[in-house]
Amino acid sequence: MATKRKASALNAAVDDEPVDPSDELAFYCLGGGNEVGRSCHIIQYKGKTVMLDAGMHPAKEGFSALPFFDEFDLSTVDILLISHFHVDHSSALPYVLSKTNFKGRVFMTHATKAIYKWLIQDNVRVSNTASSSDQRTTLYTEHDHLSTLPLIETIDFNTTHTVNSIRITPFPAGHVLGAAMFLISIAGLNILFTGDYSREEDRHLIPAEVPKGIKIDVLITESTFGISTNPPRLEREAALMKSITGILNRGGRVLMPVFALGRAQELLLILDEYWETHPELQKIPIYYIGNTARRCMVVYQTYIGAMNDNIKRLFRQRMAEAEASGDKSASAGPWDFKFVRSLRSLERFDDVGGCVMLASPGMLQTGTSRELLERWAPNERNGVVMTGYSVEGTMAKQLLNEPEQIPAVMSRSAGGVSRRGLAGTDEEQKIMIPRRCTVDEISFAAHVDGVENRNFIEEVAAPVVILVHGEKHQMMRLKSKLLSLNADKAVKVKVYTPANCDEVRIPFRKDKIAKVVGKLAQVAPPSDQDDGRLMSGVLVQNGFDLSLMAPDDLREYAGLTTTTITCKQHITLSSASMDLIRWALEGTFGAIEELGSNERSKVKEESTKAVNGEQEIKEEPADEEIPMEETQTYLVMGCVLIRYHSRTREVELEWEGNMMNDGVADAVMAVLLTVESSPASVKQSAKLKHHHHHHSDLELPNPHAHQGPEETFENLLMMLEAQFGSNIAPIERPRIPSGIRANRTTKADPSVSAAVKTKSDAAGETPAESQEDESTEEIEAAELARLQALGIPYPGIEIKVDKHVARVWLENFEVECANTVLRDRVRVVIERAVETVSSMWGEGHPAARASNGTQGNKEVAVSKSNEIEARA
């Protein structure tokens, strides 16, 4: 019973051509698939492997926070690229370098490495001292982190580096200081990995831009916000200030959980600028607390050149103010805030009155921000303002739902004594803290929203898009939106949303392009009109780059030295003459070139020439003259030299060793080794002996004499198809002899033209055209009758080999072809076919028959033409 096919199966395009596994791009998602956190991806193409990011999940602990490293052999990774310093993108790097079999090279930007050093060091300390579990697994130590720092290599934006035939180019991503998008090129396939990126104009970062003049084949991009749209920047800044001032006006404290570096610096610029324009707020302090806050601010002051024009303008302005005041100790940098104070820890914090506190970490899992949350949450006058993205499973995400209580993880007594490990037992886990503070969310996360991300994807115009770094529902909404845009596109975009541990394989067949250099670059390339002209040279591959050059240029352009290997082979034949050898070689290779022989006169002439400018030396007469051996030399296919020594019947082959010449030499040796035993050679040898011995006039019987013209023609086609393929067809229309065409053009009777004019006008033809068509048909019919009387079934045969066409006229076996190589080859094959199959249409050699038996028949055709013209 027939089953109904799915519509997708009926509409799917069928591609029967198999795909080479090396032509497939493999994408493995070890983390960050359908989730935000522990970003880690693997791309493989043409035997090259690149790892993108190595982060940890902020909502998990121990090995569960790591990407799924066990699913992939990290020893095969060539390059590891870190997009930026955030923990969900870089904090697993010390584990990879110190605890796995990773052997590749690691790259990040200068600013990323500078901040990464302090950020990961602080993260290790906080994780080991403030944990929600008594049995926390230590993934790596501070020593592991510091010892692996020298393994990290730094690169600049907009610079291209080639590592193991992989080209990488970082571009500004606009997410945080040093954040980079990476363009990866492998064997001509361009892959753009955005990491976390932002296209929004802010106060200190350069927004991300599409790489100019580069065709992107695969785009790997974040999908953090899906298709959600953020309000304009000015509206969000106004809402932020309104929320903060509202909390302060009611006598409360403002807690802003942020990452120690990144958005915190942008928020500090906004607050410092607002406080400067509002004197009534200047009595309220702004605190920026964190173990690495002060040290990392030095990094921001160092890399002002990597920031946007706003920071550079502010830097020049404050430098001018400092010079004008004459006080060299005055603050002159854009990161020297007037109203922001840095705190190392809460030990020196006097928690009295209103304030604005920026504390890390941003997810409120542990650390200073969690301790302040537990301290301020019971007071309804206080407020929490969330400005970053909140990951699923974290306290920050739970707080957005405004729960009535929160679990106590960090706690301090009134005297400032710390109680550690509150969540270590079941009894301590029951301790809950009431939440009465307000919770506001105003997004300043430096991620593209739905509109910005979609516009960027459209501008890149990559045929393949892979979405990562996004919750499943956000990712699927963005995928649906992108697929809905395919209706107006000629080339449909493929969108992939792999989950963790998923593998995506995408076929890419890239054309191999070779760059012509050296002497060959000065030769004009062959045009379409050139008949089979080829450009030959040496193809050199360096990684995935191909260069075509002349052998003489190998040392200069490829750094290679060349060695020519001359091969020689000696074969001794018992009875074959050079005539038989040449006949056999021409039957296989077509026309061969004769280079001459070393006759004694030439040798004597060379020996009597003056030496070093001296006079000719007079030779003494010899007592006995030894006959000089004559050597005949021929060149086969322009590469194999054959020397035949007639006295010893030794054949010497010499050629320059390479793949092409070796094949030709093998074929020549195969012909020579069978020349004395093959049936065709025996027949030819008997014919040659018969011509030389005139005492025997007995003719050999023709085994094909009983064949008719049609059978003979079929045998001829069979032999031609064996040599040139099946694209052979008979020619139906004969050639009109040149003598008949001349008579038709020179003899023209005006009275006949006038008589025919009235008939041709009715038919819509001119008299000359009508008369010419009728006479041509009758002449062709007479020519066909003449050929059939000779036993020739068709005027000729047309042979097509690739784009070349050869025509063989069977009356005299004349070959017409624009390509000289094919013409000579067809001529030799026709002669061998005639001699092997039968005597064709008459007795004797084809050329002799054409000259002896054609003249009378042509005279009959000419007289027939004259008769037609007279009758007309």
Swiss-Prot record:
Its EC number is 3.1.27.-. One of its GO terms (molecular function) is metal ion binding. Residues 682-706, 741-777, 844-872 are annotated as: Disordered. One of its GO terms (biological process) is mRNA processing. The active site is at H447 (proton donor). It is an enzyme of class 3 (hydrolase). Zn(2+) 1 binds at H84, H86, H175, D196. Zn(2+) 2 binds at D88, H89, D196, H469. Residues 686-695 have a biased composition (Basic residues). Keywords: Endonuclease, Hydrolase, Metal-binding, mRNA processing, Nuclease, Nucleus, Zinc. SMART domains: Beta-Casp, CPSF73-100_C, Lactamase_B. GO terms for cellular component: mRNA cleavage and polyadenylation specificity factor complex. Component of the cleavage factor I (CF I) involved in pre-mRNA 3'-end processing. This is Endoribonuclease ysh1. The gene is ysh1.
